[in-house]
Amino acid sequence: MSMNTLELKSAYEAAYHKSATAIYFAPGRVNLIGEHTDYNGGFVFPCALSFGTYLLVAPNDEQKINFRSLNVEAVYSLELTQLTTPLPDKAWANYPIGVFAQFMKRGVAITQGYDILFWGMCLQALD
């Protein structure tokens, strides 16, 4: 499945009944040399790919963060006070929840709820 940003905006509006206030794109990457050495201080020769993951977001009036993905059916909604507790069963939302948890660990106050929609073109790992 391929989508453009207009289709992603429409999908966000269908899911949350409002417009996204920001859209982000994180390109996938491959390492031509140096696989798994970059996070250990080693050298790598990566290149960005034209496919990756999109994130659409807007603040909400609730004290919770809502996570949806167009790639999987599971939808998650967490109170702001739950953002440091991982979800059970290897839930996909644990990845973005972990980002929020690390911000909080570093003293960033998460005081606003958000409605978040993900869509990615990268292959998903299987267990």
Segments predicted by a language model, with ranges:
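ATP-binding N-lobe of GHMP and related small-molecule kinases
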Residues: 2-127
